[in-house]
Amino acid sequence: MSGDSGSAGAGNGGPPDIDTSVAHVARVYNYWLGGTTNYPADRQAAQQAMAAYPDLALSARANRAFLARTVRWLAGQGIRQFLDIGTGIPVNNNTHEVAQAIAADSRVVYADHDPIVLAHARSLLTSSPEGATDYLDADLREPGKIITAAAPTLDLGRPVAIVLMAVLQFVMDEERPGDIVAELLDAVPSGSYLVVSHPASDIDAASMRELAKRLNRLMVQRVALRSRAEVTQFFDGLELADPGVVRIPEWRPDSPADRGIPSTMWGGVGRKR
C-alpha cells in the first residue's frame, strides 16, 4: 500500500521509476511469502525483521491463507462483489481467483497506490468471462476516490465485501483509520461485509515492538501495531461473524491443526446490518 515512486531503480535491476535502493513494504512482504519480486534492500529489511520475530514469514503466509478462507466464506454467503484495498504484489490465491472459482460471475476491484504493484497489475485482471476485475491506482487514505472509481465495475446498490488485508497498520492514528473504514462502509448497502487483518501489539508484545521498530527504521512506510480491542473498533456497528476478532489462524481454520500456526495478527469479518 501507499508506495511512493522514487528515483529510477535501473541501477539495482528494478523497473524504471521505482527506487529499489530502499526497502518497500510490498516487496518485503513478497519476500516473506517466498516471492521473487524483491531486491537486496527489501531482503535485508525482511531478514532483520525476522531476527526480531523468527516466525514472521509463517505469519505472513497465514495472512494469505486467511484471505483465501474469508473470500471462500463470503462467496458461500452469496457475496459476488469484492473491493480489495492495499492488495500488494500479486502472488497465488488472489481474491478474484478464489471468488471466481466458487462463483464465476464474481466482480473484484483491486486498489493500491504503489508503482511496483501497478507494474504487476496485469495478473490481477485475468477475470473469468462471466465476472470482471479492475485495478485502481488509489490510496486507502482517499476512500471517496476509491468508491467513485470502483463504481463502473461494482454495483454499489448490492452488497460488497471490503477487504483490508494487512493494510490499516500503515495508517497512523492521527490519520484517523477508523474514519476511513467508516466512509468506505457508508458507501455500501446493508448486507455488505468488512474483512480486516492487522498486526497485533498485544501478542508476543516485546517481539512485536522490536519488529515494528526495525521496520520503521528500514522502510519508507511506517507501521503501527494495534491491540485486539483497537482492531475490534474497526467493526463498530457491524455484526461480527463467528468467531469474532481472533488470531488469524483461528478464524475458521481448514483443519484444527492450523490453529497452532504462528501468527501475531488479529483478524475478523463483520456484516453491515
Map each language-model feature to its residues.
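A short, conserved alpha-helix within the catalytic core of class I
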Residues: 143-148, 170-184
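Short, glycine-/aromatic-enriched active-site segment of Class I SAM-dependent methyltransferases
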Residues: 205-220
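Core SAM-dependent methyltransferase catalytic element
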Residues: 244-273
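Short "lid" loop at the C-terminus of a central beta-strand within the Rossmann-like core
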Residues: 167-170, 199-203
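Short, conserved active-site loop motifs that form the nucleotide-linked donor/cofactor pocket
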Residues: 106, 132-133, 160, 192, ...
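Conserved beta-strand signature within the Rossmann-like core of class I S-adenosyl-L-methionine
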Residues: 160-164, 180-199
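Rossmann-like AdoMet
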Residues: 1-138, 143-144, 148-156, 185, ...
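Short alpha-helix
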Residues: 222-245
